[in-house]
């Protein structure tokens, strides 16, 4: 099956339309390619679009590339895409793999729609006789640089990105017999959802999930670095908006080997979940890190997260070689939980406002005695309080306002009792 290239433009029927594009062993390989000025309009109905691609010899693979307009109309529509980067040829790096690359307008209309995309980076080549292995390619599930709108309805967006593994440098058994022979290639970066535009799910009980798995660096010789894993990345100036409904945003980042860097949600833009009882969950896991040199943050960045009205939950966790980290947030991010009985779990360099309602702060990663508390004034929960943790001589401060209950590993306090013991 060949690449489906638009134009020629496509207008569907009022029934259930199906479009499939597949391109294998090409460089670059693109399953469905909508060019600037091109459009796909499938009108109403339960429509299905599928794009599959595999690059060759280190070439890139993109399941669906949209630089024009893709509109599936009203109805419960499904868009699926797989983009595999090609493995590196001798001496080369693996190619990048992207499930959906949108720099135009992608609109699924009203209805309970589903978008799923997988991007796998290619493996770096193996080099013998003391050479350097190729680096793994980057993998991105959904890369949105334009407008992505799923309209009204209970919509689901899922992106999974796997970085390619680095190639061996020298003999594959060099870690056993010749420890300093060759240098392994680095693993590629894996990002589930990378948003540099507008991602809007409209009203409804929506779910956005991103999983990013960094590629590994092979052992043997001088070991390369493991690739970063980022579940959801929302850059400066970009927005993720889920509007009214019980929405869930989940970012899972995974990485392994030396210099592991992992983020569940990396937000430098704005994430707004709108009204409703919403959940935002960021989890970062690093394994087999050299001398525990991994960097893991459940939620990180310099942006803003707003959950508006409703009984909302935000949870940030980081796990390094099986050990839950006490510091799971970073970058100085600002979080506003709005009105409602909210729950927040996590600690790090951030400012968190519980807003109005009976809000709970979960600090069960710490005993009460491990944190220095300042700024607490009895009867005034709106006064900014600061929790400070001494991390190997490095003080880490966490600023909060508007919380009424505080849970530690060994105790729990109301605001007034915490103030009395601050």
Predicted regions and their residues:
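Extracellular beta-strand repeat scaffolds in secreted/surface proteins
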Residues: 49-51, 77-81, 115-117, 157-159, ...
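Glycine-centered beta-turn/loop sites at beta-strand termini
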Residues: 12, 21, 42, 72, ...
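Conserved consensus positions within extracellular tandem repeat modules
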Residues: 15, 24, 43-45, 73-75, ...
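N-terminal segments that cap or nucleate solenoid repeat domains
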Residues: 1-62, 67-68, 72-77, 242
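Collagen triple-helix signature
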Residues: 58-61, 78, 85-97, 114, ...
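Thr-biased low-complexity repeat/linker tracts and other Thr-enriched repetitive architectures
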Residues: 60, 69-89, 93-120, 138-155, ...
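Acidic, glycine-rich low-complexity repeat segments characteristic
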Residues: 1, 95, 137, 186-197, ...
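Structural detector of coil-to-beta-strand junctions
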Residues: 29-33, 39, 61-63, 78, ...
């Amino acid at each position: 099956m060949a690449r489906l290239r638009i134009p020629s433009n496509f207008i569907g029927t009022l029934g259930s339309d199906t479009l499939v594009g597949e391109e294998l062993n090409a460089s670059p390989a693109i399953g469905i390619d909508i060019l600037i000025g091109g459009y796909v309009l499938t009108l109403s109905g339960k429509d299905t679009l599928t794009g599959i691609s595999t690059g060759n010899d280190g070439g890139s693979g993109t399941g669906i590339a949209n630089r024009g307009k893709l509109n599936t109309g009203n109805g419960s529509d499904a868009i699926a895409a797989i983009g595999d980067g090609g493995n590196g040829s001798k001496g080369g790096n693996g190619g990048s793999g992207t499930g959906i690359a949108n720099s135009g307008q992608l609109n699924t209309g009203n209805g309970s729609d589903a978008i799923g995309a997988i991007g796998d980076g290619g493996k770096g080549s193996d080099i013998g006789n003391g050479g350097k292995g190729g680096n793994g390619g980057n993998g991105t599930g959904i890369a949105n640089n334009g407008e992505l709108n799923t309209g009204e309805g209970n919509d689901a967006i899922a992106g999974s990105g796997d970085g390619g593994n680095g190639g061996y440098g020298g003999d594959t058994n060099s870690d056993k017999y010749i420890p300093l022979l060759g240098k392994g290639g680095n693993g590629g970066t894996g990002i589930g959802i990378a948003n540099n535009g507008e991602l809007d799910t409209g009203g409804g009980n929506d779910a956005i999930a991103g999983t990013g798995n960094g590629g590994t660096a092979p052992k043997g010789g001088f070991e390369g670095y493991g690739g970063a894993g980022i579940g959801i990345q929302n850059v400066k100036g970009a927005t993720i908006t889920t509007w009214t409904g019980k929405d869930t945003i989940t970012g899972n980042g995974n990485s392994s080997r030396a210099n592991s860097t992992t983020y569940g949600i990396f937000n430098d833009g704005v994430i707004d979940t709108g009204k409703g009882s919403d959940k935002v969950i960021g989890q970062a896991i690093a394994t087999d890190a050299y001398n525990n040199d991994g960097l893991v943050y459940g939620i990180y960045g310099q942006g803003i997260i707003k959950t508006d009205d409703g009984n909302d939950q935000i949870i940030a966790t980081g796990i390094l070689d099986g050990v839950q980290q006490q510091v799971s947030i970073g970058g100085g991010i600002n979080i506003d939980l709005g009105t409602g009985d909210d729950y927040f779990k996590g600690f790090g360099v951030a400012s968190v406002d519980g807003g109005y309602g009976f809000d709970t702060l979960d600090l069960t990663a710490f005993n009460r005695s491990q944190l220095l508390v300042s700024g607490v004034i009895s009867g005034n929960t709106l006064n900014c309080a600061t929790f400070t943790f001494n991390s190997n001589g490095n003080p880490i401060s966490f600023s909060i306002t508007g919380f009424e209950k505080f849970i530690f590993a060994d105790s729990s306090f109301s605001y007034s009792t915490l103030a009395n013991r601050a």
